[in-house]
């Protein structure tokens, strides 16, 4: 199955997403902020990144832009998973290079379908 990096500063959200993904056989890597997420993505080269937006330090938009503009990580798809549901945030996320944008709380079926679609290309 896929190696998925979750970048989220909420322990509760990290737990929920990890449980959903591991239940379906995915390997989960974790980072609690954007800077650590970018560093871990460069080091581990996950198949996909699930990125929150609101985090201390480097926010999810900034981290997504860094990942998608870096030759080392530009092929790694980023899916934003956040509580921010404004249309302007969705547009901005896509402009930063995110492949998709999901609003929390996200149900398991939607999350898995989105990951599979992004991985399929």
From Swiss-Prot:
Residues making up the signal peptide according to the UniProt record: none
Keywords for the protein's UniProt record, in alphabetical order: Phosphoprotein, Two-component regulatory system
Residues recorded as bearing 4-aspartylphosphate in the entry: 52
Gene3D superfamilies: 3.40.50.2300
Residue ranges constituting the Response regulatory domain according to the UniProt record: 3-119
BP GO terms, sorted: phosphorelay signal transduction system
Pfam families membership: Response_reg
Biological role: May be a part of a signal-transduction system that regulates twitching motility by controlling pilus function (extension and retraction).
Protein name: Protein PilH
Biological source species: Pseudomonas aeruginosa (strain ATCC 15692 / DSM 22644 / CIP 104116 / JCM 14847 / LMG 12228 / 1C / PRS 101 / PAO1)
Lineage: Bacteria, Pseudomonadati, Pseudomonadota, Gammaproteobacteria, Pseudomonadales
């Amino acid at each position: 199955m896929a190696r998925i990096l979750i970048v989220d500063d909420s322990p509760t959200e990290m737990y929920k997403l990890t449980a959903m993904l591991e239940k379906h056989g995915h390997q989960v890597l974790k980072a609690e902020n954007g800077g650590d997420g970018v560093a871990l993505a460069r080091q581990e080269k996950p198949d996909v990144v699930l990125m929150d937006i609101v985090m201390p330090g480097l926010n999810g938009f900034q981290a997504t832009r860094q990942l998608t503009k870096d030759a080392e990580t530009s092929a790694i798809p980023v899916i934003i998973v956040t509580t921010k549901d404004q249309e302007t945030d969705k547009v901005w996320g896509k402009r930063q290079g995110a492949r998709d944008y999901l609003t929390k709380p996200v149900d398991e079926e939607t999350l898995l379908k989105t990951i599979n679609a992004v991985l399929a290309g």
